[in-house]
Curated annotation (Swiss-Prot):
GO terms for cellular component: cytoplasm. One of its GO terms (biological process) is dTDP biosynthetic process. Coiled coil: none annotated. This is Probable thymidylate kinase. Keywords: ATP-binding, Kinase, Nucleotide biosynthesis, Nucleotide-binding, Transferase. One of its GO terms (molecular function) is ATP binding. Belongs to the thymidylate kinase family. It catalyses: dTMP + ATP = dTDP + ADP. Pfam families: Thymidylate_kin (PF02223). ATP binds at G8, I9, D10, A11, S12, G13, K14, T15. Its EC number is 2.7.4.9. HAMAP family: Thymidylate_kinase. SUPFAM superfamilies: P-loop containing nucleoside triphosphate hydrolases.
Length: 196
């Protein structure tokens, strides 16, 4: 399973880039686009109760992710592109939960072949969010996004993410990302042909 993950803070452009990558690669490869949270039940629970307990959220996201990973492993495709993965739990719940516990919880999940971090300044993300939603507490969101962004940058160093400037035009981000993904697919194809 070739797994590419797109990560970043809220409003960094993850979903848009993931869709564009899938569209660009689909003519030549069997591509599956997915996202987390994965199951509708978890999404509905999160929307209904709006929980703030970060331990509870980490457990819910991990249960959802376990279902997601099992489903991904059952797919017969060349590439899976996921909008978020366990790094989101480490970045977001890592603001208020013991990092060692979170990493232990996430250790059962396979590492992606490639993780792209769309890095945007918090003020850019907040402006994008302001254009989407009316009722955000921007001061609270600003404080938490600063820490989440720092967590992502720390994870990027540790897990060797490819960091892209999320303020670049979509065409440029797509071009850079396609190059990275095609490099991954070429190397996995050549490894597969060497084994035959």
């Amino acid at each position: 399973m070739n797994l590419v993950v797109i990560e970043g803070i809220d409003a960094s452009g993850k979903t848009t880039l993931a869709k564009r990558l899938a569209e660009s690669l689909s003519p030549r490869f069997k591509v599956l686009l997915t996202q987390e949270p994965f199951t509708d039940d978890i999404k509905q629970l999160l929307e209904k109760y709006q929980w703030k307990d970060q331990v509870l959220l980490a457990l819910l996201f991990s249960a959802d992710r376990r279902i997601h990973v099992k489903w991904m492993e059952s797919q017969n495709v060349d590439l899976i592109i996921s909008d978020r993965y366990f790094f989101s739990t480490l970045a977001y719940q890592g603001v208020g939960v013991d990092r060692t516990w979170l990493e232990s919880l996430s250790s059962i999940f396979p590492l992606p072949n490639l993780t792209i971090l769309l890095d945007v300044p918090v003020n850019v993300a907040l402006e994008r969010l302001r254009n989407k939603r009316d009722s955000l507490d921007f001061e609270e969101k600003r404080k938490s996004l600063h820490q989440v962004r720092e967590n992502y940058l720390s994870l990027a160093r540790r897990y060797n993410f490819k960091i892209l400037d999320g303020t670049l035009p979509l065409e440029k981000l797509t071009s850079i990302s396609l190059e990275l993904v095609q490099g991954l697919l070429s190397s996995s194809t050549s490894r597969g042909s060497q084994g035959t």
